[in-house]
Amino acid sequence: MRKYLIIILLAVGLAGASAQRAMNRPYVDDKLVHFGFSLGMNFMSYSVVESLEPVSGRLDGGTFSNQILHARVSSLFPGFSVGFIADLRLARYLNLRFTPELHFGERTITYVSESGDLGKFSTDILCMPITFPLMLKWSADRESNYRPYVIGGGGVSYDFGQDKEKMVLQKPLDYFIQVGFGCDFYFSWFKLCPELKYQLGFNNALTPINERSEGISADADGFYTNAIKHLRSHMITLTFNFE
């Protein structure tokens, strides 16, 4: 992850250096409505509440019974995000934004038994949510060719990446809040806006094993799900907005 942060800081630094010239597009922020698009990366995770109830099942060709499993998200993998921007100017410093985005990512949940008999094992969850956030953007005064801002709001998401063959199945619908910050850099033909956001889901994203009618054997593989009581989604996105 450090490598990605270094690349990001270099890109932002170059953008800032380019912006320290004559004022570009001095009246662009006076437009009532404008549009754009975004490209970037994401890091998806869960907060996991364990059930701490004994589970049984089949693992690596053998069976086990009455084991208490601990689960956590073991790694963060970078994903890809692309989106559309619609911006409505409400006041000099305040804008209303609708920014639907499609995200491609992956989460890995790692399990370990309390007794230590089973060792570590994991399952991957491929995610492809489309988010529909409605955000308020508050901007500071413009300085030369840059203008920092903060942003916040909420919305709804729907995950199209469900794979019923996976050991853990995420519910497709979720509601979330989102906060972040960024900076507008003004160039001759467009604004480039690096933006960092954090998203927190409200719903329990876990599909209980008794609600799954196909895909896995509840008796043999249900322990992946039964070891968990609650999943709440988290996502960090870094996007470069072109407006």
What are these regions (language model features)?
Residues 1-24, 240-243:
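Bacterial Sec-dependent N-terminal signal peptides
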Residues 19-78, 235, 241-243:
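Short glycine/proline- and aromatic-enriched beta-strand/turn motifs that initiate or cap beta-hairpins
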Residues 24, 172, 185-243:
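Predominantly the C-terminal beta-signal and adjacent terminal strand-loop region
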Residues 26-33, 41-43, 85-162, 237-239, ...:
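Gram-negative (and chloroplast) outer-membrane scaffold detector with strong preference
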Residues 31-33, 76-80, 126-130, 146, ...:
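Residues that define the transmembrane beta-barrel architecture of outer-membrane proteins
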Residues 49-73, 105-125, 160-170, 206-228:
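Flexible, solvent-exposed loop segments that connect beta-strands
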Residues 146-147, 164, 168, 190-193:
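Short conserved catalytic/interaction loops centered on acidic-Pro-aromatic/His motifs
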Residues 157, 178-186, 191:
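Conserved C-terminal beta-signal and adjacent last beta-strands/turns
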